Amino acid sequence: MATLRLTKLLPWAALLVMGALWGLSFSLARIVTAAGGTPFGVTFWQSVVCGVILLGFTLARRRPLTLDRRHLQIYVIVALLGASIPNSLFYFAAPYVQAGVLSITVTLIPIITYAVATAIGSERFSAVRVTGVVCGAVAIIMLVVPESSLPSRAAMPWVLLACLSAVCYALENIYLSRPSLQDIGPVRTACGMNLFAAAIMLPIALGSGQMFMPSLSFGTLEWTIIGLGLINAVAYTTFIIVIRLAGPLFASQTGYVVTLAGVIWGIYLFGETHSAWVWGSVVVMMLGLALVTPRRTDADADADDNAAEAS
């Protein structure tokens, strides 16, 4: 009985840990830029740390990366959509946007994913789920339109820039949902994504003058970069564990925890305060996420069993 109870609680515990870690990353983004990290430079070093950790994980499992032409193309595309572009945008926005507000924009990912998937015909139209998309749009309007929503009106374009990151992640989700990509596995995909993101960002950081070398004395900048890389690696691996334990639909609830954790971390670390408009945006965004998340069907049971087999 105790073992059964523990088995039921484990996915919830993993969900909370994963959400808390990813939620912390928004505050760390503000810390790393305040410590002197440049957007392109931080994106490069974060990708290096995360990629090396996941590479060690894949090698330990004797499931190394496949480096034929097809897989290289996949790694480059997901590196651009899932790391290089969205991470850089987030780090450009981080100095100007509260950590809690940054975390709200991430909730747009599943909402935008459904909107784009419906537009290209890979998802069926659903009035309920479209209502969720509308809620997402309303939530962002509540953030950027009212005069009193943000501490400074100067933050508005940076909030919209952060929303572009969500668009990138949504496009990545749609690309990775293609059946022809399912043989790679999520952990190896994340490993290849980060290693290739580092390769992409290296010349960009050097050419833009944003490359920096971490100090061997390890100050705030260096520890925060390591923390960001560790969070991405650990949280992503935990995400795979949750899928295996409880299925992808259960794991999709991560968005709720990440947003709330991001807001709470911002309050705890920076003493952030939010207007009624921001809190209202959180509620509307959560409603949108709930509406756009697909309902479980009988067919999902088999999908849950196979969701992470190739990892």
Annotate each PLM feature.
Residues 53, 58-62, 90, 109-134, ...:
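C-terminal transmembrane-helix exit sites in multi-pass transporters
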Residues 54, 125-147, 201, 256, ...:
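Hydrophobic transmembrane alpha-helices of multi-pass small-molecule transport proteins
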Residues 42-45, 83, 87, 101-108, ...:
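Helix-helix packing/entry segments at the starts of transmembrane helices
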Residues 7-11, 36-44, 67-73, 145-168, ...:
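Juxtamembrane helix-entry segments on the extracytoplasmic side of multipass membrane proteins
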Residues 21, 25-26, 55-106, 142, ...:
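Specific transmembrane alpha-helical segments of multi-pass solute transporters/efflux pumps
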Residues 1-41, 45, 151-178, 199, ...:
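Glycine-/small-residue-enriched transmembrane alpha-helix faces in small-molecule transporters
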Residues 54, 113-115, 119, 150-211, ...:
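Transmembrane alpha-helical segments that form core, pore/gating elements
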Residues 10, 34-85, 112-113, 167-172, ...:
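Transmembrane alpha-helices of multi-pass small-molecule transport proteins
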